Amino acid sequence: NGEDGIIEQITKELNINNGTFCEFGASNGITSSNTFNLIKNKNWSGLAIEADKNRYNLCVENYKPYPNVQIKNGMVLFNNAEYNLDKWLEKSNMEKDFDILSIDIDCDDYYVWENMTQFNPKIVIFEVNSYRDPVFDELPRKPSTEYNIDLLRQQKPGRVAQGCSF
């Protein structure tokens, strides 16, 4: 869907050459990955987190040629201090101002992002529900498996939505 090209252009404009990332909802590390192109072709390092054990095992296998990538099995939760994003990043010794955060957990994306307070990635990638308008002022009243992302709501101070691909 063009994500690799969008990401490459943004990293070029920000002058990020050999960066760091965290991708959770990493799946098998290749399919639907927002960071694999950077790992494979730009020698990026970082953290891939996948909750599903089978997909995690595939990710471990697929990332064997890339020792700069840590692969973790577990869930990233917004309402559990032991498994929130800050804790995962802290345990993995991630830099406070790492380059890319890719969120693709098919639920609670907004709440996980909202509760990340200790780290400040330069670029944040969200999954959107392509069946809905990506810019709407609506959010489920409670966390759910409905992955609706409101681009305007995702903007934290100093952040601007740059694009959306379907």
Where are these regions (language model features)?
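SAM cofactor-binding core of SAM-dependent methyltransferases
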Residues: 1-88, 100-103
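Helix N-cap/coil-helix junction residues
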Residues: 16, 94-95
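Conserved acidic-Pro-Pro-aromatic motif
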Residues: 37, 43-45, 96-103, 107-166
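Distinct, well-ordered alpha-helical segments
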Residues: 83-89, 112-117
